[in-house]
Amino acid sequence: MLQLIKGFKDILPGEADRWRRIETLAAVTFGAFGFSEIRPPVMERTELFKRSIGEDTDIVEKEMYTFEDRGGDLVTLRPEATASVVRAYIQHKLYADTPVAKLYTIGPMFRRERPQKGRYRQFHQINAEAFGVAAPYMDAQLIFMLMILFSALGLKDTRVHINSLGCAQCRPAFKQRLLSFLEGRKADLCEDCTRRIDRNPLRVLDCKVDRCRHVSAEAPQITDFLCPGCAAHFDEVTGLLTDLGVGFDIDKRLVRGLDYYTRTTFEVQTDRLGAQSAIAGGGRYDDLVKLLGGPDQPAVGFAVGLERLVELVAMEETVSDVAHLRLFIAALGERARRRAFGWMCELNRRGFDVEMSLEERGLKSQMKTADKWNASHVLIVGDAEMETGSLILRNMKTKAQQEIPLGDVPGALITMMDNRQEN
């Protein structure tokens, strides 16, 4: 029997429903903030990622799925989405339509990492990118929007960690000081970091090897080298977050693993996933559009790891009341099944999640099916109930039951489900 490739995962129907609800809620949330969806391809020219992510990064050096196609072009399955969105933004001149472009995308990424819990070689991200605004208001708005999404998903114990990486004006002095420090600690670094320090010493700060992390903890801090403009920008971002009621920790050791970040960088972390604490991350990349051949346009964005988000939502047991409002109709007898089928189709037509058994089965068997389907309510209707004119609606969580007059179906069910949606 053929099996999955190592590091890949099938998302089965029950779990896929949770994925779809999260993706839908993200789209609605981002839309309320003026973001529009974009769908770039999953494959790009390799050069795009080398130039944007950085040739000295682990992603480019070790993790990308890169191959030569039959035409002789070197292509790569995207390891992240920002570079693709920027490429599309430039190629299609989206900057010509409006001075500010807010875009989001949801889809799979590919990295040949060591598979572990919550981390796969095909993984999925929700990305949001905003172009054309250099003001710190946009940084704060994106972080606020992200936390609104997490709140809507019912997530708890999440915290923003934020830092500034400076700009082309102030970063060189920091790099020089960092390089001097690392040269004296070469013996304590891993082989990769020893090789990288001359070309890009910042990569050492992002290394996950324990002995390199110990060295990083003692390294100079970039916030001590910020130019007046970067310092003011960072102060304004944190001030705006405070005004918005977003809690955060200033993490002077936070360095994202992509070369294109400037100024603001941040992660949202949780202590509920063990060592894999980051569930989202992003920052400002004011030089990337120009680097990839576009106009000099500032930009800021973030990415959310969907696999980790799904795991967290499953821990909370609910995305929202609406997401779990699922009705199963248990019909006993042909007459009851005929009526129930009509009700189900009418409710399906109105967009509600309703299911029933289309073949003759006992009540016990149907209740097991309803439970496996994660029904929130079961409507029990048999030929006897058809005679008395009173049906039973059971709440599967509380086990409470209520009677619904036969003449009120499906109107009573539509009203109930509409009211739950409004709540």
From Swiss-Prot:
Its EC number is 6.1.1.21. It is an enzyme of class 6 (ligase). Keywords: Aminoacyl-tRNA synthetase, ATP-binding, Cytoplasm, Ligase, Nucleotide-binding, Protein biosynthesis. One of its GO terms (molecular function) is ATP binding. It is found in: Cytoplasm. GO terms for biological process: histidyl-tRNA aminoacylation. The keyword Cytoplasm applies. It catalyses: tRNA(His) + L-histidine + ATP = L-histidyl-tRNA(His) + AMP + diphosphate + H(+). Signal peptide: none annotated. One of its GO terms (cellular component) is cytoplasm. PROSITE patterns: AA_TRNA_LIGASE_II. InterPro entries: aa-tRNA-synth_II (IPR006195), aa-tRNA-synth_II/BPL/LPL (IPR045864), Anticodon-bd (IPR004154), Anticodon-bd_dom_sf (IPR036621), His-tRNA-ligase (IPR015807), HisRS-like_core (IPR041715), HisRS/HisZ (IPR004516). CDD domains: HisRS-like_core (cd00773). Homodimer. HAMAP family: His_tRNA_synth. Belongs to the class-II aminoacyl-tRNA synthetase family. NCBIfam families: hisS (TIGR00442). This is Histidine--tRNA ligase. The gene is hisS.
